[in-house]
Amino acid sequence: MSLDISKYPILALANTPDELRSLPKESLPALCDELRTYLLNSVSKTSGHLASGLGVVELTVALHYVYNTPFDQLIWDVGHQAYPHKILTGRREQLSTIRQKDGLHPFPWRGESEYDVLSVGHSSTSISAALGLAICAEKEQENRKIVSVIGDGAITAGMAFEALNHAGDIHPDMLVVLNDNEMSISENVGALNNQLARVLSGSLYTSIREGGKKVLSGTPTIKELLKRTEEHLKGMVVPGTMFEELGFNYIGPVDGHDVNELVRTLKNMRNLKGPQFLHIMTKKGKGYEPAEKDPISYHGVPKFDPSNTSLPKSSGGKPTFSAVFGDFLCDMAKEDSKLMAITPAMREGSGMVRFSKEYPNQYFDAAIAEQHAVTLASGMAIAGYNPIVAIYSTFLQRGYDQLIHDVAIMDLPVMFAIDRAGLVGADGQTHQGAFDISFMRCIPNMVIMTPSDENECRQMLYTGHKHTGPSAVRYPRGSATGIQVNNEMQALEIGKGRLLRETKVTDKGERVAILNFGTFLANSLEAAEKLDATVADMRFAKPLDEALICELVTNHDVLVTIEENAISGGAGSGVIEFLMKNRLVKPVLQLGLPDEFIAQGTQEEMHIELKLDSNGIEQQIRDYLDL
């Protein structure tokens, strides 16, 4: 349910950018206050990304006020911060549906609005896309302006610098806005972020500035000289020097929460020629004290009461697979001082907070740099250490060449703990972990494990850690099954599955064997009970348990493979390839994710829609058997 807009009288007059631009400039600060309150009250009722949007309210208002969107094109990097943009571009009444099935997309999405120029979700893509648009805008000669907004976390990625370097070389008319809030999802790391965080606060700059003021403050002429010297010194210290060297005209840093100052600055920059760089300083979670104090926790929030000073506690219950991984890391590090855990800026989401505190010398946050994270691990493996890369399935896509070139070709013992494998829920198309089995299965030397529950996950993590070549353990987002986890760890035999249920031998009907890969096992067993089918927990997508497959082929009329991965190229395809290679002709029904980008919705909702719940599995098998 949308909020009562009558409580937000100025925001009510700005449902579109055209309406916003008709407002007097004097009303913009009050509009920002209402927009921030509306955002807080809406997201707290529905859940979603909060702190990022709170931090860019003034910037969003100023950009749409100065630029003639949608003719002028505005690109948001990643998109967590785009809720105010959605509110001001005709989607205010639908904000209560964001991240829900059939609701507003969680990020800017081309199919949703003409104001969303680029569909986003992954970081560091905005400058490259903006550069492409700017090149074409110049060719069209329509005086179209192009703006990209990127955060201080996203700009650390190599792709962003590749785009900056190219833009500085060819000199198109475009604006890059750096939203510097000293915080991405996890705390930013790396030399660049350290420099950004030290703007105007470095000891050299501060001591010279303050010392000079004390000595020379009494002389007006000297004071003016001191001011100029201060500006010159600033140019040597702050990141502007670096961006100027890349070919950009650097302006900043500017207060990102002074909307009228932002409007003035943007108007001044709008018609400047060549690549422009505006550096603004903001506070993530601005205007809501709990989010300002803890922007990591308030990055993505459940439903909560804004009048409380903390988010609701988890109800406990079943552990998440991420927590199982985190516990494994801590337990394994007790006995292996050469274990090295790497994450590309996903410490909290990957369950690594405790490990990072207890074993700081074995923990490495590579920042938003998946390519670097993978090759960093290869270097550690070459040095005789035991690296583990904790990475979301969707982000491993960004390190694919490194997985092949820097790990698999050399057969290095790097284990990939692949979180968010399968459907992730509310984040939708850009974050579904739909492809990792498919793109890893074709890589020589890879071992791919698909645990069905948390205990199997723990044992597979141990198996991968002890393996002498590259391996991957893939597991889904969210709660595990709740079974007892065996603290003792034992390496599994590579490429061996297990038979869990056997069909009764009858002369009636076709005998069905379900080959399960991963956490659909409970659904498979439930469907099998109704169908009297055999169920095998295959465990390994590569190498396959070929002996078990041969046994199932011999004793059954139909095979059914099931996995939470794209059907195309997945584990089921591997089963068929093995059968054809060995002239084992048998009908095979492949169940999994269809050949489409799957939209947002809860995992349960989407499993039902895709007929991957127990009832759906049963029905698909019955339809295939024509029962």
From Swiss-Prot:
<comment type="subunit">
    <text>Homodimer.</text>
</comment>
<feature type="binding site">
    <location>
        <position position="370"/>
    </location>
    <ligand>
        <name>thiamine diphosphate</name>
    </ligand>
</feature>
<dbReference type="GO" id="GO:0008661">
    <property type="term" value="F:1-deoxy-D-xylulose-5-phosphate synthase activity"/>
</dbReference>
<dbReference type="Pfam" id="PF02779">
    <property type="entry name" value="Transket_pyr"/>
</dbReference>
<feature type="binding site">
    <location>
        <position position="288"/>
    </location>
    <ligand>
        <name>thiamine diphosphate</name>
    </ligand>
</feature>
<dbReference type="GO" id="GO:0030976">
    <property type="term" value="F:thiamine pyrophosphate binding"/>
</dbReference>
<dbReference type="GO" id="GO:0000287">
    <property type="term" value="F:magnesium ion binding"/>
</dbReference>
<protein>
    <recommendedName>
        <fullName>1-deoxy-D-xylulose-5-phosphate synthase</fullName>
        <ecNumber>2.2.1.7</ecNumber>
    </recommendedName>
</protein>
<dbReference type="InterPro" id="IPR005475">
    <property type="entry name" value="Transketolase-like_Pyr-bd"/>
</dbReference>
<dbReference type="GO" id="GO:0016114">
    <property type="term" value="P:terpenoid biosynthetic process"/>
</dbReference>
<dbReference type="GO" id="GO:0009228">
    <property type="term" value="P:thiamine biosynthetic process"/>
</dbReference>
<feature type="binding site">
    <location>
        <begin position="153"/>
        <end position="154"/>
    </location>
    <ligand>
        <name>thiamine diphosphate</name>
    </ligand>
</feature>
<keyword id="KW-0808">Transferase</keyword>
<dbReference type="GO" id="GO:0052865">
    <property type="term" value="P:1-deoxy-D-xylulose 5-phosphate biosynthetic process"/>
</dbReference>
<comment type="pathway">
    <text>Metabolic intermediate biosynthesis; 1-deoxy-D-xylulose 5-phosphate biosynthesis; 1-deoxy-D-xylulose 5-phosphate from D-glyceraldehyde 3-phosphate and pyruvate: step 1/1.</text>
</comment>
<keyword id="KW-0786">Thiamine pyrophosphate</keyword>
<dbReference type="InterPro" id="IPR005477">
    <property type="entry name" value="Dxylulose-5-P_synthase"/>
</dbReference>
<keyword id="KW-0414">Isoprene biosynthesis</keyword>
<feature type="binding site">
    <location>
        <position position="80"/>
    </location>
    <ligand>
        <name>thiamine diphosphate</name>
    </ligand>
</feature>
<keyword id="KW-0460">Magnesium</keyword>
<dbReference type="InterPro" id="IPR009014">
    <property type="entry name" value="Transketo_C/PFOR_II"/>
</dbReference>
<dbReference type="Pfam" id="PF13292">
    <property type="entry name" value="DXP_synthase_N"/>
</dbReference>
<feature type="binding site">
    <location>
        <position position="181"/>
    </location>
    <ligand>
        <name>thiamine diphosphate</name>
    </ligand>
</feature>
<dbReference type="Pfam" id="PF02780">
    <property type="entry name" value="Transketolase_C"/>
</dbReference>
<keyword id="KW-0784">Thiamine biosynthesis</keyword>
<dbReference type="GO" id="GO:0019288">
    <property type="term" value="P:isopentenyl diphosphate biosynthetic process, methylerythritol 4-phosphate pathway"/>
</dbReference>
<dbReference type="InterPro" id="IPR033248">
    <property type="entry name" value="Transketolase_C"/>
</dbReference>
<dbReference type="InterPro" id="IPR020826">
    <property type="entry name" value="Transketolase_BS"/>
</dbReference>
<comment type="function">
    <text>Catalyzes the acyloin condensation reaction between C atoms 2 and 3 of pyruvate and glyceraldehyde 3-phosphate to yield 1-deoxy-D-xylulose-5-phosphate (DXP).</text>
</comment>
<feature type="binding site">
    <location>
        <position position="181"/>
    </location>
    <ligand>
        <name>Mg(2+)</name>
    </ligand>
</feature>
<comment type="similarity">
    <text>Belongs to the transketolase family. DXPS subfamily.</text>
</comment>
<feature type="binding site">
    <location>
        <begin position="121"/>
        <end position="123"/>
    </location>
    <ligand>
        <name>thiamine diphosphate</name>
    </ligand>
</feature>
<dbReference type="InterPro" id="IPR049557">
    <property type="entry name" value="Transketolase_CS"/>
</dbReference>
<dbReference type="InterPro" id="IPR029061">
    <property type="entry name" value="THDP-binding"/>
</dbReference>
<dbReference type="GO" id="GO:0005829">
    <property type="term" value="C:cytosol"/>
</dbReference>
<keyword id="KW-0479">Metal-binding</keyword>
<feature type="binding site">
    <location>
        <position position="152"/>
    </location>
    <ligand>
        <name>Mg(2+)</name>
    </ligand>
</feature>
